[in-house]
Curated annotation (Swiss-Prot):
Belongs to the RNA polymerase beta chain family. GO terms for molecular function: DNA binding; DNA-directed RNA polymerase activity; ribonucleoside binding. This is DNA-directed RNA polymerase subunit beta. Gene3D superfamilies: 2.40.50.100, 2.40.50.150, 3.90.1100.10, DNA-directed RNA polymerase, beta subunit, external 1 domain (2.30.150.10), DNA-directed RNA polymerase, subunit 2, domain 6 (2.40.270.10), RNA polymerase alpha subunit dimerisation domain (3.90.1800.10), RNA polymerase Rpb2, domain 2 (3.90.1110.10). It comes from the Eukaryota. Pfam families: RNA_pol_Rpb2_2 (PF04561), RNA_pol_Rpb2_3 (PF04565), RNA_pol_Rpb2_6 (PF00562), RNA_pol_Rpb2_7 (PF04560). Its EC number is 2.7.7.6. It catalyses: RNA(n) + a ribonucleoside 5'-triphosphate = RNA(n+1) + diphosphate. It is found in: Plastid, Chloroplast. Keywords: Chloroplast, DNA-directed RNA polymerase, Nucleotidyltransferase, Plastid, Transcription, Transferase.
Amino acid sequence: MRRDGNEGMSTIPGFNQIQFEGFCRFIDQGLTEELYKFPKIEDTDQEIEFQLFVETYQLVEPLIKERDAVYESLTYSSEVYVPAGLIWKPGRDMQEQTIFIGNIPLMNSLGTSIVNGIYRIVINQILQSPGIYYRSESDHNGISVYTGTIISDWGGRSELEIDRKARIWARVSRKQKISILVPSSAMGSNLREILDNVCYPEIFLSFLNDKEKKKIGSKENAILEFYQQFACVGGDPVFSESLCKELQKKFFQQRCELGRIGRRNMNRRLNLDIPQNNTFLLPRDVLAAADHLIGMKFGMGTLDDMNHLKNKRIRSVADLLQDQFGLALIRLENVVRGTICGAIKHKLIPTPQNLVTSTPLTTTYESFFGLHPLSQVLDRTNPLTQMVHGRKLSYLGPGGLTGRTASFRIRDIHSSHYGRICPIDTSEGINVGLIGSLAIYARIGHWGSLESPFYEISDRSKEVQMLYLSPSRDEYYMVAAGNSLALNQSIPEEQVVPARYRQEFLTIAWEQVHFRSIFPFQYFSIGASLIPFIEHNDANRALMSSNMQRQAVPLSQSEKCIVGTGLERQAALDSGVSTIAEHEGKIIYTDTDKIILLGNGDTLSIPLVMYQRSNKNTCMYQKPQVRRGKFIKKGQIVADGAATVGGELALGKNVLVAYMPWEGYNSEDAVLISERLVYGDIYTSFHIRKYEIQTHVTSQGPERITNEIPHLEAHLLRNLDRNGIVMLGSWVETGDILVGKLTPQMAKESSYAPEDRLLRAILGIQVSTSKETCLKLPIGGRGRVIDVRWIQKKGGSSYNPETICVYISQKREIKVGDKVAGRHGNKGIISKILPRQDMPYLQDGTPIDMVFNPLGVPSRMNVGQIFECSLGLAGDLLDRHYRIAPFDERYEQEASRKLVFSELYKASKQTANPWVFEPEYPGKSRIFDGRTGDPFEQPVLIGKSYILKLIHQVDDKIHGRSSGHYALVTQQPLRGRAKQGGQRVGEMEVWALEGFGVAHILQEMLTYKSDHIRARQEVLGTTIVGGTIPSPEDAPESFRLLVRELRSLALELNHFLVSEKNFQINRKEA
C-alpha cells in the first residue's frame, strides 16, 4: 500500500510516465547494480588485477540531436565512461584510467529510442512472478492431486507433488520424479536436520526405507542420485567436481535462483524470515513448501489463483535494459580476461584502455533493439497510436507464452485487472487477451506489481486521501465501484452501492466501504477512454473502436470532435506532437519551419516539424498557432501537430450522417458518401513514401550514380539532375527514374562483334559493359518529390556504401474502396460517391454527407453512436462542444437520453427549426430524396457523427496483373501484391464456375492463366501473329507435379486416350 501526497482531486498521470520512470530507474540503479557485479579479473599467474571503480561512472551527452539522428539514420546514444584500474601485485603499483566501454541508446521525450534512425519502443511484459504456487488437479480416477510449483527468476519450474499415500515427490521432468529427501540432501541437509525442520516428521519417516536411506546417506550419494534422475543417464555415475558444476549450471542456476522478488514472495507465502539478500532456493524453503503441501492435503491453507495479478510481475523497460547491460558486461569480462592473458604471453605491458573494447556493449544493445521481440518499431500512424504503443502489456516474448499455447483462462478478464489492465483494449486475432493495455491511472510498483489508486474513506479524518494499492492488498478491502457511486450525496448512510471484495462483487451499505474509485475512466485504457457513451456499447464493438482509432490517418484539415470525453487534450499533450513553449516572451517571427521567440533579452528559435514521414507513410507536421507580436506564457501550445487542433486530439471529421437504406449501396457495412467530402478536401490526407537504393562495390568495380543511362527513353530521365538524382519538387509518374545507376559487368564473348574481339586480342583491352540498375518508381507511387537524402556510412573500408533515399508526397482524397469508421466500432467501406444534388437532404436543404445502414446498430448493440449522432447535431446548431464522462447513469436513470433530448430541444428553439426535435419521433426527422424531391416514407435518424478515415486505403490494396513471375515448382503465378502475384482460383471458386457451366472460362483459368507452360506460350504467339488460340492437350504442370510426388511414393499414375477411329489405347506419359 502506497500513500500519495495528493489529497482531494486527482490529476491524470502522464501517459508516457511508465516508460520514463523505467528508463530513469535503469540509469540510476540498474547500471550501478550491474557494474558492482563486475568481478576483479586476474591473469593466470595472479600478478595483474583489473577492476572497475563504479562510484564515478559517467554518461556523456550525445553529440548529435534527435532530429539529426533520424535524418542521417544514426543511433541517438550516450557514451559510457567508467574509471578502471590495473594493479601489479608484486609492487602494488596501480594505473588508473577512465575508459570508454560503449554506447547506450537514450530515451527521448516520446518514451522511445532512436536506433539507426528508426524510432523503437520497448514493450512491458507480464510474467509469472517467481515464488511457489499451490494447485489441485484431478487424476484419471477423479482424486485430487495437490502440487506445489516453484518458479525461479529465470522462469524454470520445479514441482512438488503429494500422492494418495502422503508421499512427497519432487518432479524434475514430466516423466521423472524423485523423493523430496534426495534434493534436500543434495542441497546440503542431512536426515536429522530435515526431520528437525519439518512440522510432520512422522510423514517423512513413513516412506523412508533402507533404499531411500542409502540414497541420502551422504551429500555425495544424494547428488549422484539426483543427477542420475535429472540427466536420465544409465549406469553408475561417479561423483566429481565436473558433475557438480554441470548440475549447478543445468538445474540449480536455472530453477533455484529466486531473485529479489521471488525471495519476498516465498517468505510471504511460507511465513519464512530468510533475509532478502539470500536469493537462492534453500533446503529450508523446500521443507517449508513440503509442510505446506501436506497441510493442503489435509484441508489446511488456500490454493493459488495463477491468473491473479498478485501472482504476476511486470518486466519493464528497466529490467530488460539491465539484463542486456549485465549480458554485455559478461562478454566484456571474457574479452578483458583473454586480452590480459594475450598481453602476458607476448610480454606486452597492458593498460586499462588497451584491455577494454566498446564492441560488447554497443553490439549487445544494437541486437536487443533490432531483434528482441519486445523491442518494436514505434507505430506512428497518428499521435494516439504512438502514445498507446508504449503502454502495451504483453504475455508474449522470451520467458512468456505463445499465441498458440495460451489457454482461454489466461486470455480472460480477471477481477484483479480492475483499474490496472483495461478490460476492453486488446488485440484481435490469435493474440486476443495476450496483449493488453494499461489503465490510465495504473503504475508499476517497486516490486514489479501493477498498482491502482483509490480514495480512502475514513471516519476519523474528513480529508480524502489517495492511496495506491497493489493487487495483493486491495482484495482485503471493500472497494466501491466507480461507475455506480452515490445517488444521494447529502445522505451517505442511506446509500447501497456495489463493491468488490475478495474477487466477488457485492452490494453493501456505504458505511462498510473502505475505498472507492477515483474516476469513471479508471478501469479503461486511453483508446477506450476516448469513446463517448461507451457504457451504451457492447464490449466487442468498444474493442474494435479502440483499435481503429489507432488506425486513423491524420487529415490535411483536422477538426476536433463536437462530442468527446474530456481526455482529448491530455492525449494530445502527452503524445509529444504539439510544440510547447519552454519560456515566456514575445513572438517576433513565425513560418512553417520555425518560431522565433524574444524573452529575457534573448532570442530563442523553436524548430517545427514539416513533412516528416512516419513508418506507416503518414505525414507528420506542425502548424504554428501563435501570431507575430503576441505574448505567450511558459507551457502554452505554440504549434499544433498532425491530428491535433487547439491542443486537442482531432483524428476525424464531424460530418452529417443519416441512418437509412439507399438503393442497396449501404448494405453489409457499405457506406454511401457525398462528393462534397472529395471536392471539399474534407477527408484528404497526405502520405509520404520512401524509396531507397544503395551503391555497392562489385567484382567488376564500383557502381556509378549517373544521369547518362543508355537504352532508356529520354522522358523517363527528364527529372534527373546532372548527378543522376531526381530533382526536388519534380512530379513523378509510375516508371520514372528516381536515381540513375549503372552496374559494371563483363559481357559474354559471343556478344562481341568479330572486329571487337580482334582489337581486344591485339591491344589486350578488357572491354566491359554496364547494366542499368536504376531506382524506378513502382506502380501506385506517383507524387511530388519533397526530399532527397544522400547518406554515406562512416566505416573503415576503402569504399563506403552510399544510400540514396527519395521521399515522395501523395495527396489522397477519399475514394471508393477506402475504409471509414466511427468511434463505436461502426466501420464500413465506401461503396459509391454520389453528386451532392442526388444525396438526401434535410428540411432546410442541407444535403447529407454520409449514409449508414440502420441494420448495423441493433444486432451489434453499439447504441452509443446514436447518442453521439443526435448530440452532435445539437452541438453543431448551438455551436457547442460537449465533454461527457462515461457512466453518467450513476447520477440518474436515463441520464444520457435526457441530456441528448434536452440539447436537441434547445437547438430546435434557438434555431427556430421545429424539425430538429419532434416529440413524436425525437432525434429523427423527415428528409427528402435528392433525385426526386419526394420525402421518404419514414422519419430518419440524422445527426453529426465524428467519422475517421483509416489507414486501410484502396490505393495500397488494389492490384492487377497481366503478366508476371511464376513459382519455380508449380509454375503457378506468385502470391501477393508485393510480388506482382495473381489471384488464386481455389477449390470453391471452381465449384462456383462449374455451377454456372462456364467450361471455357474454367479451362482458361486452370490452364492458360495458370500453370500450363506450353499453352501460355502458344497464347502469346497467337496473340501477336493472330488466329485462333489452340486448346491445351496435355496436363497442366501442377497435375504433373502431383504425378511425380506419387511416383516418389512408388505409385504409378498415367492417363490413357482411346482413339475414336479404331478404339485403340494410345498411352501418353503424364
